[in-house]
A protein has these predicted regions:
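Eukaryote-skewed repeat-based solenoidal scaffolds used as protein-protein interaction platforms
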Residues: 87-98
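Conserved glycine-rich acetyl-CoA-binding loop
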Residues: 77-88
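A conserved beta-strand-loop-helix scaffold within acyl/acetyltransferase catalytic domains
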Residues: 5-79, 97
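Terminal substrate-recognition subdomain of acyl/acetyltransferases
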Residues: 1-13, 34, 38, 98-218
Length: 218
């Protein structure tokens, strides 16, 4: 059956909707999901056979004049369809960005706790931080801006792009093939103390000409 992806205003979610989101056995409990409803503008769901397989809370806005897609929370059911669901949710994010910011380069940012979830950003350019690169200057400044917007700047370490006690939301995706994660990427994430609440702030760019392709409805 086809994947059905739908976006609504987050404020329109009912208690039943939130309970359903909590039932996919992802990383977030009902309290955290309810807080995301308050913090973010858009709520996107992905269904197969009318069964919820994933959701996103996000906002499209400008930071310092630059168009941004802020993925405040994403969670995907651990099923054989997880890769398809991830592609669908990211495709919807790109589509919304294309509608809001046509002909502009756009920053896409989120928080991560595992390296395999970074597959979500495989269509982005200049993903930061990245193994083997040393982010400086404006690159680090973008990390600070996003940490502040995510509300995790109080204990943010700019050189590592790590926010302590920052798990109010992140991109919750577990790959079917975690063994394929490159050792250098796993090493980059080794600085996180995930049980203590650490997250890594990661962002990338989609150029205007690429966004036209990524944001097209299939």
């Amino acid at each position: 059956m086809p994947l059905v992806v739908h976006t609504n205003d987050a404020v329109s979610l009912t208690d039943a909707d939130l309970d359903e989101m909590g039932s996919i056995e992802g990383a977030f409990d009902i309290g955290t999901i309810s807080k995301a409803k308050e913090d973010w503008v858009l709520a996107t769901t992905a269904r197969i056979d009318d069964k919820l397989h994933g959701f996103t809370f996000s906002t499209l806005e400008r930071i310092g004049g630059t168009p941004c897609v802020l993925l405040g929370m994403m969670s995907i059911r651990r099923s054989s369809k997880r890769d398809q669901v991830l592609r669908g949710l990211m495709g919807e994010a790109y589509h919304r960005a294309l509608m809001a910011f046509p002909d502009e380069d756009v920053v896409v940012g989120s928080r991560f706790v595992t390296p395999d979830a970074l597959i979500a950003f495989d269509k982005l350019d200049e993903v930061t931080p990245s193994p083997g690169t040393n982010a400086v200057g404006e690159e680090r400044e973008w990390g600070r801006r996003l940490a502040k917007r995510f509300g995790v700047d109080r204990k943010y370490e700019a050189t590592l792009f790590v926010a302590r006690e920052g798990q109010t939301g992140f991109l919750d995706f577990a790959s079917n093939t975690p063994e394929k994660v490159k050792p250098a990427l796993a090493e980059m994430f080794s600085v996180l103390n995930v049980p203590a609440g650490d997250v890594m702030v990661v962002y990338g760019w989609t150029m205007a000409e690429d966004l036209v392709k990524h944001g097209q409805r299939s």
